[in-house]
Amino acid sequence: MENLKNELLEAQVGKVLENEPLANHTTMKIGGPADLLIIPKDIDAVKTIMDHVKKHQTNWTVIGRGSNLLVLDKGIRGVVLKLGTGLDHLTVNDEEITVGGGYSVVRLATSLSKQGLSGLEFAAGIPGSIGGAVYMNAGAHGSDISKILVKARILFEDGSIEWLTNEQMNFSYRTSVLQKERPGIVLEAVFKLKQDDREKITKKMQQNKDYRKETQPYNRPCAGSIFRNPLPEYAGQLVEKANLKGYQLGGARISDMHGNFIVNAGGATAQDVLDLIQFIQKKIKEDYNVEMHTEVEIIGEEN
C-alpha cells in the first residue's frame, strides 16, 4: 500500500489521504477508516489511479457525497475513490446536458431551473451526487433518473470505461445494471430535458423541497431512505404502523418524523444501525409478513 500511495502522490492525481475516517465523508457521520482515500482531480486522474490500482491488484471502492451509504465500523480495505469537485463539470447544449458524476444533485436541479430546463424538479432536496443518483436510479414525486437519462459513462470493475445507453442501464425501481449485473461507477451522464416556464419549474421545486423539510429529518445525520418500498406498501408507513418511530438502539434512532429514516442520535456506530435495521426487518415480518429490503448501500469490512 505504501508503494501505491507514493506512486499516486508522484502522479499528482489529486488528494491522497491515508487511514482516513470515512465518518468524515458520509452524511450519517459513521464509518471506519479507508486504507487510502483518493479524491481525483479529474476523469483523466481516475484513469491513472485505476491503472496503478490494477498494477498492484488492490481492492477499490467508489463513493460520492456519502449519502445513501452506511460504511461499517472497520472501514474499507484498499483504495476508496471519492468523486467530488474534480468531477463536477457541467455543459449545457440546448436541452441536452453533460454533467460529472461528482456534481451535486441539488445544485444541478437548481442550476437547470434557472435556465428554464425541466425534468429534474423531482430531485429538489435529494442529497448526494449525480453518479450515485444514476447508479441507484434515484427518484421522488413520481419520477426518477431513468426518465431523463440518455447515456452514462461508466468505469467498470476491470478498469475499462465505456458509455451505456438508457436501455443498457436496465433501470427499474431504485436499481440499475451497475449494482449487480455489471458493477460500475458513473463518471459522467448525459440528460435530455425540456424547456419550460422558469417560474413554474421553480415553484414545483420549492414545493418538493418544502415537503422534504416537513416530512424528512435531513437536519440530522442520516443516510436517506433505509428500506426500499415493498410496493404496494410503503416502508415508512409499515414502520409507523408497528409503532417503531422514535425507537433507539445505541446511538441509532428511528426518526420521529419518518419511519423509513434512521438518524445518528449521537455517537452511533454502524453496528448500532445494522442492529436496528435487523430489528425492524424482524418486527415487520412478524407483524405484517412483509420482507423489508435495504435501499441504503452497506459497504466495508465486517466485524
From Swiss-Prot:
The active site is at R174, S225 (proton donor), E295. It is found in: Cytoplasm. The lineage of its organism: Bacteria, Bacillati, Bacillota, Bacilli, Bacillales. Gene3D superfamilies: 3.30.465.10, UDP-N-acetylenolpyruvoylglucosamine reductase, C-terminal domain, Uridine Diphospho-n-acetylenolpyruvylglucosamine Reductase, domain 2. NCBIfam families: murB, PRK13905.1. The gene is murB. This is UDP-N-acetylenolpyruvoylglucosamine reductase. One of its GO terms (cellular component) is cytosol. It comes from Bacillus pumilus (strain SAFR-032). GO terms for molecular function: FAD binding; UDP-N-acetylmuramate dehydrogenase activity. Pfam families: FAD_binding_4 (PF01565), MurB_C (PF02873). PANTHER family: UDP-N-ACETYLENOLPYRUVOYLGLUCOSAMINE REDUCTASE (PTHR21071:SF5). Pathway: Cell wall biogenesis; peptidoglycan biosynthesis. HAMAP family: MurB (MF_00037). Its EC number is 1.3.1.98.
